[in-house]
């Protein structure tokens, strides 16, 4: 029976085309998305956010994938070409990059539904029975095959993945739905200020994860109807879902119930949530297991030397405690505690780095103390700098301090030039 079930799901995934919406600005991340789209943002020591929905597709058996790009997409496209360009079309697999090309109108993508509509011919050429539309800006582990199976078994025309979240978290941030006892959706609001609570829990609501399954022809028809509606905002949550739930079978797919202990989803749309999700990775056994060989997270693998820790004097020791340190890093006579260092980070002597997310190609000079910080790519932290200990002083220096006291530092804030950095400087480990 298990073999039959696996074969059944594999047939469904082969008949599916996945479209990942990766054009979001991520404006709540402020300066972290000044030069990059949110899906291109770094996460977990070596990955980009876009790697997670792409890896979910591959691990679920979906190998026909389109990635819709728009906002500041250069670094995202470069990453996709370098890390995801190995698929072979002749074997029925591909990752296609779909920037706004204005083939159907003079406008850029005007909303999530319009982004799909403007690529309808590309989808049609693939002849899929089902189309999955996926969010490209969340960190999550999800077996799409199970969602496809539930979609087919329920007789749905559309299925929306959902999860229970606190009301205050959903307000103004997520689409919120109500369902009957069979999880058929009978109400939907996009980012309401006052979400409808669950009947059995007045403190929580059922929020959309932004992942959808459609029967292909039904999707095409709804996109055509929406394109002719001059009052539409061209958005699935604002327009299409509310317009179809009364007359068509649209079902919710409860993410937590199907994922079991392996279910993991994080919205990293703010500085605080981005920092918190990265900090989860330094736990001894994090909920998102990046070391699970049965569900690997794929990414571009830059060729780098191993991480190195040097000096063991009484007043300086290169060490990392409860931390993640990536290739190309040198921790020279400083202590790294409960932190993540992405590739090519150099930390010089006599420093203390705690609860920090250090993005690639950063250099931290001698005698620095950093705590609860995010250091953006390419920053050079001057000798003797202290950040995260006096938040008012940090604000006065031009750093961004989040609601929960996380300090974001970028090259612009340090008065350092932006652009032209392709690799970390060649720094002597004796410093």
From Swiss-Prot:
Name this protein carries in UniProt: Glucose-1-phosphate adenylyltransferase
Pathway participation: Glycan biosynthesis; glycogen biosynthesis
EC number: 2.7.7.27
Protein role: Involved in the biosynthesis of ADP-glucose, a building block required for the elongation reactions to produce glycogen. Catalyzes the reaction between ATP and alpha-D-glucose 1-phosphate (G1P) to produce pyrophosphate and ADP-Glc.
One GO biological process term: glycogen biosynthetic process
Subunit note: Homotetramer.
Gene3D superfamilies noted in UniProt: Hexapeptide repeat proteins, Spore Coat Polysaccharide Biosynthesis Protein SpsA, Chain A
PANTHER family the record matches: GLUCOSE-1-PHOSPHATE ADENYLYLTRANSFERASE, GLUCOSE-1-PHOSPHATE ADENYLYLTRANSFERASE-RELATED
Family statement: Belongs to the bacterial/plant glucose-1-phosphate adenylyltransferase family.
HAMAP family (UniProt xref): GlgC
Keywords: ATP-binding, Carbohydrate metabolism, Glycogen biosynthesis, Glycogen metabolism, Nucleotide-binding, Nucleotidyltransferase, Transferase
GO MF annotation terms: ATP binding; glucose-1-phosphate adenylyltransferase activity
Catalytic activity: alpha-D-glucose 1-phosphate + ATP + H(+) = ADP-alpha-D-glucose + diphosphate
Domain of life: Bacteria
Binding-site residues, alpha-D-glucose 1-phosphate: 109, 175, 190-191, 208
């Amino acid at each position: 029976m298990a073999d039959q079930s696996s074969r059944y799901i594999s047939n469904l995934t082969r008949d599916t085309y996945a479209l990942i919406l990766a054009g979001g600005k991520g404006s709540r991340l402020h300066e972290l998305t000044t030069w990059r789209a949110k899906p291109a943002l770094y996460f977990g020591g070596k990955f980009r956010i876009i790697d997670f929905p792409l890896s979910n597709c591959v691990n679920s058996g979906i190998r026909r994938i389109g990635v819709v790009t728009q906002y500041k997409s250069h670094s995202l496209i470069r990453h996709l070409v370098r890390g995801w360009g190995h698929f072979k079309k002749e074997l029925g697999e591909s990752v296609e990059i779909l920037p706004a090309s204005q083939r159907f109108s003079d406008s850029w993508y005007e909303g999530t539904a319009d982004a799909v509509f403007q690529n309808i011919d590309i989808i049609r050429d693939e002849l899929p029975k089902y189309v999955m539309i996926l969010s490209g800006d969340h960190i999550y582990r999800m077996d799409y095959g199970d969602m496809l199976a539930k979609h087919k078994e329920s007789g749905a025309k559309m299925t929306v993945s959902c999860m229970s979240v606190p009301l205050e978290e959903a307000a103004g941030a997520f689409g919120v739905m109500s369902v009957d006892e069979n999880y058929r959706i009978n109400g939907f609001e996009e980012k309401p200020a006052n979400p409808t609570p669950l009947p059995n829990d007045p403190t929580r609501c059922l929020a959309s994860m932004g992942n959808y399954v459609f029967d292909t022809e039904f999707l095409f028809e709804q996109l055509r109807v929406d394109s002719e509606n001059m009052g539409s905002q061209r958005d699935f949550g604002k327009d299409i879902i509310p317009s179809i739930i009364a007359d068509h079978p649209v079902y919710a797919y409860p993410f937590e119930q199907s994922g079991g202990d392996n279910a993991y989803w994080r919205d990293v749309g703010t500085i605080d949530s981005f920092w918190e999700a990265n900090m989860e990775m330094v736990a001894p056994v994090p909920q998102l297991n990046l070391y699970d060989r049965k569900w690997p997270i794929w990414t571009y693998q830059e060729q780098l030397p191993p991480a190195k820790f040097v000096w063991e004097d009484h007043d300086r020791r290169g060490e990392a405690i409860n931390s993640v340190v990536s290739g190309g890093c040198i921790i020279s006579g400083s202590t790294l505690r409960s932190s993540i260092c992405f590739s090519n980070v150099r930390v010089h002597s006599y420093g203390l780095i705690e609860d920090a997310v250090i993005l690639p190609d950063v250099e931290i000079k001698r005698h620095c103390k950093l705590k609860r910080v995010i250091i953006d790519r390419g920053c050079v932290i001057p000798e003797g700098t202290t950040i995260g200990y006096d938040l008012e002083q940090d604000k006065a220096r031009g750093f961004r301090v989040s609601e929960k006291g996380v300090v974001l530092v970028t090259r612009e804030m340090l008065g350092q030039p932006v652009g032209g950095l392709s690799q970390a400087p060649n720094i002597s480990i004796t410093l």
